[in-house]
Amino acid sequence: MIGAFARKFFGSANDRRVKGYQSRVKAINALEPEIAALSDDALRARTAEFKQQLANGKTLDDLLVPAFATVREAAKRTLGQRHFDVQLIGGMVLHEGDIAEMKTGEGKTLVATLAVYLNALAGNGVHVVTVNDYLASRDAGWMSQVYSFLGLTTGVIVHGLDDVERKAAYACDITYGTNNEYGFDYLRDNMKYRLEDMVQREHFFAIVDEVDSILIDEARTPLIISGPLDDRSEFYNTIDTFMPNLEKVADYEIDEKQRTVALTEAGMEKIETLLREADLLKGDSLYDVENVSVVHHINQALRAHSLFTRDKDYIVRGGEVVIIDEFTGRMMPGRRYSEGLHQALEAKEHQPVQPENQTLASITFQNYFRMYKKLGGMTGTAATEADELADIYKLEVVEIPTNLPIARLDEDDEVYRTQNEKYAAILAEVERANARMQPVLVGTASIEKSEVLADYLTKHGYKQIDFGDPKSMRKLYAAARAGKPAKLFAVLNARFHEQEAYIVAEAGVPGAITIATNMAGRGTDIKLGGSLEMRAQFETADIADEAEKQAKIAEIKADIERFRGMVLKAEEVVEIEPAKGSKPAKTVTHPGGLYIIGSERHESRRIDNQLRGRAGRQGDPGRSKFFLSLDDDLMRIFGSNRLDTMLQRLGLKDGEAITHPWINKALEKAQQKVEARNFDIRKNLLKYDDVQNDQRKVIFEQRVDLMKNESVAETVADMRHAFVEDLVAKHVPENQYPEQWDVAGLKEELKRVLDVELPVDEWAAEEGIAGEELLSRIESRVDEHMAAKVGQWGPDVMRYVEKTILLQTLDHLWREHLVMLDHLRQVIGLRGYGQRDPLQEYKSEAFSLFESLIAHLREAVTGQLMRVEIVPPEEEQPALPEMEAHKLDPNTGEDEMALAQSSFARASLASEGSEGRSRRDPNDPESWGKVGRNEDCPCGSGKKYKHCHGRYA
């Protein structure tokens, strides 16, 4: 209470910060007449003047006022739009590297031009990040008019561009693209072998549109570039046939809050029986160590069948299982669940099971965007996640006042006992709104729910149409002109994502009914009366004559204005029945405008606020209401049984709803609990990912340094000497007498790893020889061996071979390291049972693994360079490791490794030996011939070849 009083008296911290920008807003406004008087050429010349001032020592902050005034005037001349004062404040927040929370329709896209232009003057490149290719292309095409007028270049990164096009786009002053494309380009760049092949520049400044969606909703989803492993499709299909035999509760239990599933004792026995019948069980028990892989597959199949629902979590399309974004309802083609879950879903849906993948490179959005020296963001809903954004990204959320007061009415939720009662109430509400020609947007939580609602409308006389189809739209426009409801509706979910922009843009036409999953269509405004841009695109496409086209556009404008007036007047007058003995009935007027109906609450308040925010843009009237049932996920998980009992005691009849602000508050508290839990999960995951991220930065920085150096001979020599030192120290310890030295072991290992025969036994037998002298002689002979290769091939060829082997070996070992870190991560939680901190244990063991990686790198590079031979051109083979030669997982969109291979087609490593398996001598690697990476090592160690002698092959 005291805090509320203080805020009322002194103002909130947000109010004070917004107030602090007013002096600069006034200064920008004062410059407006002067800037407006400039010619186009003079206005354009200001860019060069600003750059010169920066070169002379001024800062970007010094140039903010004149630069913003310049952009405002350029926008007026090119777009016919003038930045409002509140938009200037939004631009300042972005420039300072914080998040501007601006309500729907307040012009976030235009706001970005202010901070983008100012920071682009530094010449380091500015990245504008959007959630999909459509918005990236749209915003780049639209705002490039302002930038090009002022002499700056604009590029756009979308799916399907080749490296030449990408590099050109990144070289521009300003680059638009999606979060996925930026992240994947970063990963692919760090798999390149030449600096000139890398496409991205440094990470200077980025503005993230819909920042909450990218930095919070997608924070737990890593970007992964991967390559296929062995085909195990039959195994997945076999395991899948077991699932129908299991019964919920009796054989497995589900924890919906934690999204986990576990077999019961009876379920384990049933699975063991099925595995024995299929001859897949090794030993006596499912949980014997040799069945670890089988248990993993069982668990993933169980998750696929019990936790993942078709048309809610994923969709089957074109023979593929495509993930659906739980927050936006959009399909995410190319994204695949990891650890065999996606393969389990493919088996469940009887689709072709794709091979499992090995991670080649990965990064989370959390760590990618933290690489930028400065980061800003825009969204309509970030205040509820302000703590997380400040904690993880050091970004403050500043709520920007709206240009006009919000006129939307947010009504209390209506809670029904069953889904059917809820849908009946939604139908009745839609019919009332449709009768008065008020456009309605119904938000659903999944494709499944959107299609249930669509079926419900269809059964009651409504017809589903495509808002992207001109013929269908003409029917809707004709009905609107006549003022009669057409009873037409459109569905926007992952099945119809191609029409997303059209459906959302026309959702404000009188009588339009749109069913949309969550926040699909985010980024496209719903304008009351419809979109001039979309209608002009439809209705003038076949008109060649310019005069006729302009006349048609004028006609459309008049139509839209008339439609807008109809929507604004679509008010509802409701009579409230009086209680017994009270005064006569009262009437309440509910506003017109867009009517938002939520069909259930989401786990996050922010998603609900986003849905509400579709209505009431730029001071327009609007209303929103959520219709809930006790069967809804959130209600069911958070104690609907108690509420159901209470409603029955209160005598709530079928079809009746309960409405009270207390219910809204209770639901918000439940949502806050979920949000807090999800925040803790993301924060904890980040702590683990930071360990890998620190190692990733070291490896990637080293790769770039190696590529920058014309010669890596010195690095290779240091690695060679360090390896020889380690080898000698292992067999000839400092504090031992010569007769205690393992001379035979040293000689054998020098032959096996370095392929050199040295008289180590003779040297060690010399009177008075010390370990240091022995080391010096070995190093000299090894250096002579390498010098002979340089003399044989020439320094140019040797430089190329050294760099090639060093980079490809580093990449190979890094991939193996990622697999080991992943395995460590999966089991480290068990350390908690031993009263040890899993995170500290993970850090310690991850560091040990990293040290081991460096040691293996020295050994492998030295061994390969000592053995490498030039192959004649007609027998050339790619120099890249086998794993790199495969096509990448679809989530990258490109076979980047094929490009990398081509740059090394001039050299290869000679194979040591070619004899068949039957003649392999465990003690003679030269007799092994070609050994598969996943075969047991012929030396008899019991390890896979790739983890044993394969390191040196």
Curated annotation (Swiss-Prot):
Cross-referenced CDD domains: DEXDc_SecA, SF2_C_secA
Cofactor: Zn(2+)
GO biological process, one term: protein targeting
Main location class: membrane
Top EC group: translocase
GO molecular function: ATP binding; metal ion binding; protein-exporting ATPase activity
EC number, as in UniProt: 7.4.2.8
Cofactor binding notes: May bind 1 zinc ion per subunit.
Residue segments, region Disordered: 873-953
Comp. bias intervals (Basic residues): 943-953
Protein's name according to its UniProt entry: Protein translocase subunit SecA
Organism: Nitrobacter winogradskyi (strain ATCC 25391 / DSM 10237 / CIP 104748 / NCIMB 11846 / Nb-255)
